[in-house]
Amino acid sequence: MVALLAEHTDTRQQAGLLVRPDNHDALSVAVTATPVVTTTGTPATPPALELDVQQGDGIGKRAGLPSRKQIETWVTSALYADAALTVRFVDEEEGRALNRSYRGKDYATNVLTFAYAESEDDPVTGDIVLCCPVVETEAREQRKPLEAHYAHLIVHGVLHAQGYEHEDDAEAEEMEAIETETLQALGFEDPYRDDHTPVAH
């Protein structure tokens, strides 16, 4: 297999030509486009982000909610393509109702991600819903700063919105490695250092 890289008309992408044997007397050729990344694996040019931050009933009164600037920083750190995302903070009642309706689980979970892109060619669009009481309880039980736990779950949700999953061990290891690298680059500790944070998808 031979892979050649070249400049792309979009400065955030690099064009590629992939040539590999198909049969004994044939070759398959594919043209690709991938984000230009730095040595740390993050895009060299930050993707464009359309961000909507929402709060459910009574959420504005809760202490420890991240600011819009923090949310935007955390979301962007985990993006590999332009995206339109909503980050919504909800109470236990709304979180439970969403989890019951869409996953068939009658309890509130820490984070839910609703990804709307139907193929890899579609723009990254999705909703990331965080249940504040659950996040606060987990941070306290795991002895983590609340800010760090919110950052972790938002990064986790952003990865889900881009198609990452943790259905098997290999997928889980990949996601955890990306999350750890991203959070450490943001100045947080490894979220999996002592505990495996339970996350929903």
Curated annotation (Swiss-Prot):
Signal peptide: none annotated. GO terms for molecular function: metalloendopeptidase activity; RNA endonuclease activity; zinc ion binding. Zn(2+) binds at residues 156, 160, 166. Binds 1 zinc ion. Its cofactor is Zn(2+). Belongs to the endoribonuclease YbeY family. This is Endoribonuclease YbeY. It comes from Cupriavidus pinatubonensis (strain JMP 134 / LMG 1197) (Cupriavidus necator (strain JMP 134)). The lineage of its organism: Bacteria, Pseudomonadati, Pseudomonadota, Betaproteobacteria, Burkholderiales.
